[in-house]
Amino acid sequence: MLTVLDFGDPLPQRPRRVLIAGVSGVGKTTLAKRVSRLLDIPHTEIDALFHGSDWTPRPEFMDDVQALVAGDVWVTEWQYQSARPLLASQADLMVWLDLPYAAVTLPRVLLRTLRRRVRREVLWNGNTEPPLRTFFTDREHVVRWSFSTRKKYRVQVPDLQKSCPELSVVRLRSPRQVERWLAGPLSSAVR
């Protein structure tokens, strides 16, 4: 049976294959990097595997995901419908960032998008955030995507009970819970 843990619950084992789940802009990659450092295991940013130049999907994406999950230890984000089943089937821990959307996630995704655009930050394979006006014209603009998909994890994560009943899931509902989980159960699992 799928085990859903609270931020203070001890982990059943030291995690070796970790997924970070949550809506766009919630802080998945930031948390994945922190988990990677704490556990001293590699983090692979799933967006870097997916996006080719000009924001096109890379044809090698699923081959790269298969190579990633074949490894003994890894941390990555639980994204992309085509990869989610494989990622979940090979993970031993999922950390679900279920943070308040209006108070936490929306400001984060807005500020991140604005910062990346203003600074012209190069993301994956030479891509940069598109002009801000595309918010109004592109249904898949990251801010619009974040808003339109903000509730899907409340269905998708519990549905894992059917396909991945042995997967442990830690559900974190606030930035404070994130910090307490990192300092508590995750740090304890490393000792």
Locate the predicted segments by residue.
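NTP-dependent small-molecule kinase module
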Residues: 2-13, 144-191
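Hydrophobic positions on the alpha1 helix immediately C-terminal to the Walker A/P-loop
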Residues: 31
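Conserved lysine of the Walker
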Residues: 28
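Active-site signature of alpha/beta-hydrolase-fold catalytic machinery across serine-
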Residues: 34
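The conserved Walker
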Residues: 24
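Hydrophobic anchor at the beta1->P-loop junction of P-loop NTPases
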Residues: 20
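Conserved nucleotide-sensing/catalytic segment adjacent to the nucleotide-binding pocket
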Residues: 42-99
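A glycine- and Lys/Arg-enriched "phosphate-lid" helix/loop adjacent to the NTP-binding pocket
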Residues: 101-152, 183
